Amino acid sequence: MIKKIIGKFFNYQTDPSFYDLDKISVEVSERDNIRSLHIGNDTIQSSMNLDDPISLQLNYTKVMALVLIFKANPEDVLFVGLGGASLQKFFYKYCEKTTFKTLEIHPHVIQVAKSFFHCPEDKRMEIINTDGVAYLNDHNESYDLIIS
Protein backbone atom coordinates (compact mmCIF):
# COMPACT_ATOMS: atom_id res chain seq x y z
CA MET A 1 0.00 0.00 0.00
CA ILE A 2 2.73 2.48 0.97
CA LYS A 3 4.64 1.67 -2.21
CA LYS A 4 1.55 2.47 -4.31
CA ILE A 5 0.95 5.76 -2.49
CA ILE A 6 4.58 6.86 -2.79
CA GLY A 7 4.61 5.73 -6.41
CA LYS A 8 1.70 8.03 -7.21
CA PHE A 9 3.36 11.05 -5.62
CA PHE A 10 7.01 10.49 -6.50
CA ASN A 11 6.89 8.49 -9.76
CA TYR A 12 8.56 5.56 -8.00
CA GLN A 13 10.39 3.44 -10.53
CA THR A 14 9.58 -0.25 -10.83
CA ASP A 15 11.72 -0.83 -13.93
CA PRO A 16 14.76 -3.02 -13.07
CA SER A 17 17.06 -0.46 -14.75
CA PHE A 18 16.20 1.91 -11.87
CA TYR A 19 18.36 -0.30 -9.67
CA ASP A 20 21.39 -0.32 -11.99
CA LEU A 21 23.12 2.14 -9.70
CA ASP A 22 26.56 1.77 -11.27
CA LYS A 23 25.21 3.74 -14.23
CA ILE A 24 24.01 6.64 -12.05
CA SER A 25 26.84 9.11 -11.45
CA VAL A 26 27.46 10.76 -8.09
CA GLU A 27 29.54 13.91 -8.46
CA VAL A 28 30.70 16.78 -6.25
CA SER A 29 31.37 20.33 -7.44
CA GLU A 30 32.54 23.51 -5.70
CA ARG A 31 31.91 27.12 -6.58
CA ASP A 32 32.17 30.27 -4.45
CA ASN A 33 32.68 28.30 -1.22
CA ILE A 34 29.59 26.15 -1.88
CA ARG A 35 30.03 22.41 -2.32
CA SER A 36 27.23 20.70 -4.26
CA LEU A 37 26.14 17.15 -4.95
CA HIS A 38 24.89 16.00 -8.36
CA ILE A 39 23.24 12.62 -8.85
CA GLY A 40 22.77 11.36 -12.39
CA ASN A 41 23.03 14.78 -14.06
CA ASP A 42 24.23 18.34 -13.47
CA THR A 43 21.21 19.34 -11.37
CA ILE A 44 22.18 20.37 -7.84
CA GLN A 45 20.66 17.88 -5.41
CA SER A 46 22.31 19.22 -2.26
CA SER A 47 24.61 22.10 -1.31
CA MET A 48 26.78 22.98 1.67
CA ASN A 49 28.46 26.25 2.61
CA LEU A 50 32.03 25.28 3.49
CA ASP A 51 32.18 27.98 6.21
CA ASP A 52 28.83 26.97 7.74
CA PRO A 53 28.10 23.30 6.94
CA ILE A 54 24.92 23.19 9.05
CA SER A 55 23.11 26.06 7.30
CA LEU A 56 20.56 25.04 4.71
CA GLN A 57 21.50 26.38 1.28
CA LEU A 58 18.67 25.24 -0.99
CA ASN A 59 15.13 26.56 -0.69
CA TYR A 60 13.51 23.13 -0.72
CA THR A 61 15.54 22.07 2.33
CA LYS A 62 14.54 25.25 4.18
CA VAL A 63 10.88 24.51 3.49
CA MET A 64 11.25 20.88 4.60
CA ALA A 65 12.85 22.00 7.89
CA LEU A 66 9.70 23.99 8.68
CA VAL A 67 8.12 20.71 9.81
CA LEU A 68 9.77 21.47 13.17
CA ILE A 69 7.15 24.18 13.68
CA PHE A 70 4.57 21.42 13.97
CA LYS A 71 6.72 18.81 15.72
CA ALA A 72 9.43 20.71 17.59
CA ASN A 73 10.97 17.81 19.52
CA PRO A 74 10.62 14.59 17.56
CA GLU A 75 12.00 11.45 19.21
CA ASP A 76 12.50 9.41 16.03
CA VAL A 77 12.93 10.73 12.50
CA LEU A 78 13.16 8.68 9.31
CA PHE A 79 14.76 10.22 6.23
CA VAL A 80 14.12 8.49 2.91
CA GLY A 81 17.15 9.62 0.94
CA LEU A 82 20.48 11.01 2.13
CA GLY A 83 21.87 13.19 -0.64
CA GLY A 84 24.45 15.55 0.84
CA ALA A 85 22.97 15.11 4.33
CA SER A 86 21.84 18.76 4.56
CA LEU A 87 18.65 17.98 6.44
CA GLN A 88 20.31 15.30 8.53
CA LYS A 89 22.98 17.77 9.74
CA PHE A 90 20.40 20.47 10.46
CA PHE A 91 18.07 18.18 12.40
CA TYR A 92 21.01 16.53 14.17
CA LYS A 93 22.17 19.90 15.50
CA TYR A 94 18.79 21.34 16.47
CA CYS A 95 17.07 18.17 17.71
CA GLU A 96 19.64 17.04 20.25
CA LYS A 97 17.57 14.23 21.80
CA THR A 98 16.34 12.81 18.51
CA THR A 99 17.47 9.56 16.92
CA PHE A 100 17.66 9.40 13.14
CA LYS A 101 17.45 6.66 10.54
CA THR A 102 18.26 7.39 6.90
CA LEU A 103 17.49 5.04 4.03
CA GLU A 104 19.66 5.56 0.95
CA ILE A 105 19.61 3.26 -2.07
CA HIS A 106 22.90 4.39 -3.67
CA PRO A 107 26.06 3.29 -1.79
CA HIS A 108 28.17 5.99 -3.47
CA VAL A 109 25.83 8.69 -2.14
CA ILE A 110 26.48 7.42 1.39
CA GLN A 111 30.23 7.42 0.82
CA VAL A 112 30.20 10.95 -0.65
CA ALA A 113 27.95 12.33 2.12
CA LYS A 114 30.37 11.04 4.75
CA SER A 115 33.54 12.08 2.90
CA PHE A 116 32.55 15.47 1.49
CA PHE A 117 29.44 16.76 3.31
CA HIS A 118 30.15 16.23 7.04
CA CYS A 119 27.38 13.68 7.51
CA PRO A 120 27.06 12.99 11.26
CA GLU A 121 28.27 9.57 12.33
CA ASP A 122 27.33 8.38 15.80
CA LYS A 123 24.76 6.30 17.67
CA ARG A 124 21.98 8.85 17.02
CA MET A 125 22.43 8.66 13.22
CA GLU A 126 21.85 5.32 11.50
CA ILE A 127 22.27 5.08 7.73
CA ILE A 128 20.99 2.00 5.93
CA ASN A 129 21.90 1.24 2.32
CA THR A 130 18.48 0.13 1.03
CA ASP A 131 15.52 1.04 -1.14
CA GLY A 132 13.42 3.32 1.04
CA VAL A 133 10.07 2.32 -0.43
CA ALA A 134 10.83 -1.39 -0.08
CA TYR A 135 11.99 -0.81 3.49
CA LEU A 136 8.78 0.99 4.41
CA ASN A 137 6.79 -1.79 2.79
CA ASP A 138 8.65 -4.51 4.71
CA HIS A 139 8.96 -2.92 8.15
CA ASN A 140 6.20 -1.97 10.55
CA GLU A 141 7.95 0.85 12.41
CA SER A 142 6.61 4.18 13.57
CA TYR A 143 8.34 7.55 13.55
CA ASP A 144 7.46 11.03 14.71
CA LEU A 145 8.51 12.34 11.29
CA ILE A 146 9.16 10.74 7.91
CA ILE A 147 11.00 13.08 5.55
CA SER A 148 11.64 12.33 1.89
Regions found by a protein language model. Name each.
Residues M1-P74, K93:
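Rossmann-like AdoMet
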